[in-house]
């Protein structure tokens, strides 16, 4: 019983540590999602937790939305072959 509990705890920790994080990016422009209120930010948290993003938590860092707990399928800044504001 103790072994099963330890294995479950380890798997949970591995999933938490290996979760993707990064700046949310607009797929069409290649730019980060901007924000003004640094730290806890309701807008960033809402965007990160949106169904199409799948994150677990979001906040404003360096005037852009930073997300934690993202699935690998969610793109983060920078996008390959796409520069923000450059054509």
From Swiss-Prot:
Record localization: Secreted
Keyword match Secreted: yes
Principal cellular location given in the protein's record: secreted
InterPro entries: LCN-type_CS_alpha_beta_dom, Scorpion_toxin-like, Scorpion_toxin-like_sf, Scorpion_toxinL, Scorpion_toxinL/defensin
Gene Ontology annotations of biological process type: defense response
Gene Ontology molecular function: sodium channel inhibitor activity; toxin activity
Modified residues (Cysteine amide): 84
Disulphide linkage map: 31-84, 35-60, 44-65, 48-67
Region forming the signal peptide: 1-19
Gene3D superfamilies according to UniProt: Knottin, scorpion toxin-like
Domain LCN-type CS-alpha/beta: from-to ranges: 20-85
Domains as described in the record: Has the structural arrangement of an alpha-helix connected to antiparallel beta-sheets by disulfide bonds (CS-alpha/beta).
Function per UniProt: Beta toxins bind voltage-independently at site-4 of sodium channels (Nav) and shift the voltage of activation toward more negative potentials thereby affecting sodium channel activation and promoting spontaneous and repetitive firing. Induces immediate paralysis in crickets after injection, with a total paralysis occurring within 15-30 minutes and lasting for 1-2 hours. Is also lethal to vertebrate (chicks) when injected in very high dosages (more that 100 mg/kg).
Protein name: Toxin CsEv3
Organism for this UniProt entry: Centruroides sculpturatus
């Amino acid at each position: 019983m103790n072994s099963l509990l330890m294995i479950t705890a380890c798997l949970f920790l591995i999933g938490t540590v290996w979760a993707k994080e990064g700046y949310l990016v607009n797929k069409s422009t290649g730019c980060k999602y901007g924000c003004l209120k640094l730290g806890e930010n309701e807008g960033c948290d809402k965007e990160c937790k949106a169904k199409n993003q799948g994150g677990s938590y979001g906040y404003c860092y360096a005037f852009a939305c930073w997300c934690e707990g993202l699935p690998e399928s969610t793109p983060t800044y920078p996008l390959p072959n796409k520069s923000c504001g450059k054509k």
